[in-house]
């Protein structure tokens, strides 16, 4: 089965060609935990730094601001067809009858007629107003097959170009593939040298599903930009640790969506083309020990005494 592949033209940003044939820019601007200046960051990323890929989600609470930034960029002369916009449906809307209305709200907030990629944010359904952590009865049964069929209908109706999944396990991915008429084009997962997520990564490669890496620098508790191994490679290559971590993801064959609200960092994060991490240094980065996920999903889905998920291991099907 054909897999997504990277391409680059002179002076152009790297892209990955998805199974659908659509081109996905390899570096996108992440907007998780973005602030009130999100519109400015999006416009700056596109018009000044050269980004053509913006990743957001309904649950981030910034889609309206992202929409303002996209509109400003297009008013500045950027064609919509040259942009790749990703969003995600939240867990409270993971019922077949809620899929289309959820997307329509996203399109309205983003001020767009279509989006390029629409993800299932997490493969779990939550009751409206669910607490963190969830109380008894707030994690509901998820009709994965029914929801995916409605996602497929969005593609058929031209509202979405590609559909994908986030935070899936191999078990859940295999279940979805058994019924999907349009397989997921992309699987978005936490990935960095401190959490390589090899099992789902290899499963996606087997099925020709492209992988996007989120949290490429780790977390505030374990910021890999301060890891001595990363710093040593960065100093050797005369790059920043952040650039090295982003490049590591690209050389691994994944797209990547670093987030920053600082103009200087936004520009720095996309200056990762035209150079390579040498093989010996790449192997050194790969040797960083896997420690823990940034996002376990525990506070969202785990009730230790009631409900289907009593631990983070349950959330991840005890796969890692």
From Swiss-Prot:
- Catalytic positions? 60
Instruction: Supply the InterPro entries for this chain.
Output: AKR, AKR4C, Aldo/ket_reductase_CS, NADP_OxRdtase_dom, NADP_OxRdtase_dom_sf
Catalytic activity annotation: an alditol + NAD(+) = an aldose + NADH + H(+); an alditol + NADP(+) = an aldose + NADPH + H(+)
> Which PROSITE patterns does the record associate with it?
ALDOKETO_REDUCTASE_1 (PS00798), ALDOKETO_REDUCTASE_2 (PS00062), ALDOKETO_REDUCTASE_3 (PS00063)
The record lists NADP(+) as bound by 215-269
State one molecular function term (GO).
aldose reductase (NADPH) activity
**Which residue numbers mark the site Lowers pKa of active site Tyr?**
88
Could you list this entry's UniProt keywords, alphabetically sorted: NADP, Oxidoreductase, Stress response
Q: Which domain of life is it from?
A: Eukaryota
Q: Which residues are substrate-binding? A: 121
Its EC number is 1.1.1.21
Q: What induces it?
A: By abscisic acid (ABA) and gibberellic acid (GA).
Question: Family, per the entry?
Answer: Belongs to the aldo/keto reductase family.
Instruction: Please report the name of this protein according to its UniProt entry.
Output: Aldose reductase
- Organism per entry: Hordeum vulgare
